[in-house]
């Protein structure tokens, strides 16, 4: 674990060294003093938070999905709280500033946004009544006057929750979740309304203008209502509900590669494959199921320990974010395996007709005699049901039920606490298993880092019984010749980075968490609840560096990270060394002159660092100062520091 402060502050110190003055460090409550960093010994990448925009709105989804438009250097941040897209000027990544917004209209919400290189942007708009058809709102992200940036809208399916643009910019794809109404019928046996889930496939014009309604087609799931589904794919609901794929499948997140789209069907524990040109769902793939008798997890929030153990329980991956990429000429997609229960209705004591949910605790199934005899092997069932072991672990009663026996012969928890990589046929080629929780358990230290904390409270072990770190956000980026997956942990926070260049042998690179666990005060806690990621290639970046932009729904912050290629840094250092070794020894006078300049620069740097001696006391500052010093001076400066 290492800690760091703003790299921008240190850059200013070094850049102004020769004038013997130090610029005042930039400060932001959203970039904490002690950024958590845990990396592999051979880490090829480094993440450093450099700037943030603070909405000042907490626990209200004021910063969710993010997108970046290179030509205007603008970040588009979904502010669901206000029903708008916040437009940020990121020309200085260390200081993103709000310049305006795009509104969905009174009573409407925006759930997602994406933007094309020419500035054509599309937002997914949810109606005040979420069961009604939503809208795709098109606007010019580079418009000088954002009040007139909107160029049109088309209707899409109910509750568009995510929007994705194909790589060629030819199509906008919207995942229409089609969630049921919040209320049940008078008998409490069915939803009042439950619209179909679908994917809108919208052909886009070449210009920055809106498509017509005729350009929007719907890819639905009706064709699968009468077909057998792959094992592990779930269709379920209240007792009086007409459960079938066309209604029960709720598209969550979408990605595409080479003419095919892949959409996560979270509650169904499935992935849909869509042919984009024909706007047709071709097949349904079962999502990964973890075997926790082999892959350990931390199942208890009552044992006062960061302890992983194996259990006779399965884990439904139930993916949220999904990202496609190519490797070796083949298509793959990665998923963040969050998990999600269904819970709809209003309690009778609150004037409703009851609540439907598939969530149940392990101890309740045991105490009610609903676990089939021998189903859990030779495990002591009473011990398993103890709250300090796994009694509070949240399970789904929609899986594992043996109708003939009238009991559960398998137990299924929500989420696999991992991320997975699939090939285009749906075969799982890699899963991170227990690595996320092993890392956070290793980092656990009171007041410094709290394993399985929630995103609104920093209490240690709080989420162990309920999806653990809850991986939700995911994006793919290429740095140098390597491909990386960035995965966000919604609850404990932070970003896991894996090298997925060879998908079958993907490996952990680093974990960074810009959070202060010593406080529950939102304004001082840093980033809470990473919801959406946008990777920016250095060719498109305002500062010439790879960037990762993160929308944090609980803290309401939009934070920019520098993504440093450590492999490239190593190569540059080696080149410097080689150049030095190969210099002509006959040019001694030239060397003397260079040395004189170097010594003068060194004196300036030392003077500046001395002026900033307060910064030197902070852990991690010494290393960062050295990283900014010219290569020939580092050895001498290192001795001084």
Feature-to-residue mapping (PLM):
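Intrinsically disordered/low-complexity terminal segments and short unstructured peptides
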Residues: 15-17, 147, 165, 593-595
């Amino acid at each position: 674990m290492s800690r760091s402060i703003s790299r921008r502050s240190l850059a200013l110190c070094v850049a102004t060294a020769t004038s013997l003055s130090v610029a005042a460090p930039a400060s932001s409550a959203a970039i904490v003093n002690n950024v958590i960093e845990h990396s592999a010994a051979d880490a090829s990448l480094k993440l450093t938070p450099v700037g943030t925009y603070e909405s000042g709105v907490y626990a209200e989804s004021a910063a969710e999905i993010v997108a970046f438009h290179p030509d205007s250097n603008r970040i588009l941040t979904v502010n669901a709280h206000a029903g708008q897209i916040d437009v940020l000027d990121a020309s200085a990544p260390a200081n993103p500033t709000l310049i305006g917004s795009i509104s969905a209209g009174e009573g409407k919400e925006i759930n997602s946004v994406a933007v094309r290189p020419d500035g054509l942007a599309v937002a997914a708009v949810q109606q005040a009544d979420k069961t009604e058809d939503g809208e795709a709102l098109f606007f010019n992200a580079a418009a000088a006057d954002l009040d007139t940036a909107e160029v049109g809208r088309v209707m899409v399916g109910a509750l568009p929750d995510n929007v994705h643009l194909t790589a060629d910019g030819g199509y906008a794809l919207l995942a229409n979740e089609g969630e049921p109404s919040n209320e049940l019928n008078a008998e409490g046996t069915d939803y009042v309304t439950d619209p179909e889930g679908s994917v809108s496939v919208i052909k886009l014009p070449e210009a920055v203008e809106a498509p017509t309604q005729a350009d929007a087609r719907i890819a639905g799931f009706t064709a699968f209502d009468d077909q057998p589904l792959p094992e592990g794919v779930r269709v379920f609901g209240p007792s009086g509900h007409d459960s079938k794929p066309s209604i029960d499948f709720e598209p969550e997140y979408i990605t595409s590669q080479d003419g095919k789209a892949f959409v996560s069907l979270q509650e169904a524990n499935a992935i849909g494959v869509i042919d984009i040109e024909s706007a047709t769902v071709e097949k349904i793939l079962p999502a990964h199921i973890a075997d926790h008798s082999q892959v350990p997890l931390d199942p208890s929030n009552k044992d006062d320990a960061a302890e992983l153990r194996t259990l006779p329980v399965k884990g439904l991956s139930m993916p949220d974010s999904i990202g496609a990429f190519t490797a070796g000429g083949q298509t793959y997609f990665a998923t963040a395996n969050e998990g999600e229960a269904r819970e709809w209705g209003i309690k009778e004591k609150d004037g409703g007709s009851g609540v439907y949910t598939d969530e149940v605790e392990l101890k309740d199934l045991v105490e009610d005699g609903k676990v089939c005899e021998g189903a859990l092997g030779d495990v002591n069932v009473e011990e398993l049901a103890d709250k300090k072991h796994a009694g509070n672990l949240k399970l789904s009663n929609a899986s594992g039920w043996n109708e003939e026996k009238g009991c559960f012969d398998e137990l299924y928890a929500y989420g696999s606490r991992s991320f997975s990589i699939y090939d285009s046929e749906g075969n799982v080629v890699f899963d991170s298993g227990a690595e996320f929780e092993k890392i956070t358990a290793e980092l656990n230290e009171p007041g410094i880092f709290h394993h399985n904390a929630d995103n609104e409270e920093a209490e240690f072990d709080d989420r162990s019984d309920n999806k653990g770190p809850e991986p939700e956000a995911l994006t793919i980026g290429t740095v140098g010749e390597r491909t990386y997956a960035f995965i966000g942990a919604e609850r404990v926070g932070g970003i896991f980075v894996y090298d997925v260049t060879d998908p079958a042998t993907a490996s952990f690179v680093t974990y960074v968490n810009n959070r202060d666990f010593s406080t529950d005060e939102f304004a001082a806690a840093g980033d809470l609840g990473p919801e959406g990621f946008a990777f920016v290639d250095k060719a498109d970046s305002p500062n010439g560096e790879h960037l990762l932009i993160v929308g944090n729904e609980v803290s309401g912050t939009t934070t920019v990270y520098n993504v440093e290629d450590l492999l490239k840094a190593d190569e540059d250092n080696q080149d410097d060394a080689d150049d030095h070794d190969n210099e002509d020894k006959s040019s001694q006078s030239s060397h003397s002159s260079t040395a004189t300049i170097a010594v003068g620069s060194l004196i300036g740097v030392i003077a500046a660092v001395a002026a900033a001696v307060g910064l030197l006391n902070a852990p991690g500052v010494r290393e960062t100062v050295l990283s900014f010093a010219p290569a020939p001076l580092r050895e001498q400066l290192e001795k001084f520091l």
